[in-house]
Amino acid sequence: MSRFVQDLSKAMSQDGASQFQEVILQELELSVKKELEKILTTATSHEYEHTKKDLDGFRKLYHRFLQEKGPSVDWGKIQRPPEDSIQPYEKIKARGLPDNISSVLNKLVVVKLNGGLGTSMGCKGPKSLIGVRNENTFLDLTVQQIEHLNKSYNTDVPLVLMNSFNTDEDTKKILQKYNHCRVKIYTFNQSRYPRINKESLLPVAKDVSSSGESTEAWYPPGHGDIYASFYNSGLLDTFLEEGKEYIFVSNIDNLGATVDLYILNHLMNPPNGKRCEFVMEVTNKTRADVKGGTLTQYEGKLRLVEIAQVPKAHVDEFKSVSKFKIFNTNNLWISLAAVKRLQEQNAIDMEIIVNPKTLDGGLNVIQLETAVGAAIKSFENSLGINVPRSRFLPVKTTSDLLLVMSNLYSLNAGSLTMSEKREFPTVPLVKLGSSFTKVQDYLRRFESIPDMLELDHLTVSGDVTFGKNVSLKGTVIIIANHGDRIDIPPGAVLENKIVSGNLRILDH
């Protein structure tokens, strides 16, 4: 928290503090307003309209940020959700499918969150353009999935990409290659907000530019921005006019987030006749998911609670797998008409996530964000569906990439499914060390992807390379100490083995 805010909180504990605080906050808001007006004067006529919308949106978020004090949830009010508010997927699936699947599919729009860069995996440009399977990128697989649906059922399900200013240009260049696919592709941009100095709480940006020295002055404000940006883009009204009724929103790097016909049918033909405006797919927590947001009952409504909102004294309780058994997959099904209604009433309420960052020059900043799932409490008749783990297959690291590139999964029409040859439906735990962090380095260290059908756990640390046709089974731990190197020879079978020390294989 900034020194400014700390000074404020001290002042609050004194007499007349609230009045003093109010004056300070008003002064600060006025200063920010002036700074934003200065920034807007640097916009060209072409940039002016969308920059003004962005800065107006930022001002609203900033105003709320200044008003908030302490954790945004009262721990005493958090309850487990009622039984009927989170339905098991098996129950949804048991209802079967309608005779005319195309009639429900034609009411759907698929939206993929495509604002992220591949920097965490050492790649420049949009993450969605990283090759994940047989040289297919995340975007290729998404297009293949939807094209398969449209061809199979003679439907017209469009794909919409929510880009950020970081990914828009590169994504649009690549979209030409899908011109002959049977998928209409649309894009819109999420907002661009200025980062603020952690001490002064004023914007770092001096002009609208986000290149050169100003590259780090701006950020995309989280996927909660989808509601306003989708509405402002005009696409929301376009789809409503075309008779579309629901959007299926998911992260483009979640390879398990395919269109599920059973969930869609449940939305379009609810058993009690009352339609859900918002469905969140949740899945059971494992020890690896303790930080994931969870669905709770709060003041009579379903509410997503993230770890950042939890008071420090209750963090361990929040992480407990026994008390909070599920977490949010960020696969969401949302009524288009409801988004329009709530957006026009300014009634979409999402908690602010304060994300601290340090810029390359060492300046400490904060960026204010919101999360798309946090809006669940603003919608009527919301529902959680507890889906199989297979619908949550995110690729955040090269460890995840190794899993999806391996023979653990088979690829069919853009969809990955667990191989029938694997005896257990669980996914192995894979931890690759820092030598594998960048995709380029990772690919160089595997002559071919090992056979992992019988693998339970793999840990690799240090300078390690794998030859062709290696097979890994059970628990395998490979550790090359600093200065050492281990080459796993071609055709090696490692089952329940620890490999350490130094092993070099050189061409004769």
Curated annotation (Swiss-Prot):
Keywords: Acetylation, Cytoplasm, Magnesium, Metal-binding, Nucleotidyltransferase, Phosphoprotein, Transferase. It is an enzyme of class 2 (transferase). GO terms for biological process: brain development; glycogen biosynthetic process; UDP-alpha-D-glucose metabolic process; UDP-glucuronate biosynthetic process. It is found in: Cytoplasm. Residues 457-508 are annotated as: Oligomerization. UTP binds at residues 113-116, 127, 190, 222, 253, 396. Mg(2+) binds at residues 127, 253. It catalyses: alpha-D-glucose 1-phosphate + UTP + H(+) = UDP-alpha-D-glucose + diphosphate. Homooctamer. Belongs to the UDPGP type 1 family. This is UTP--glucose-1-phosphate uridylyltransferase.
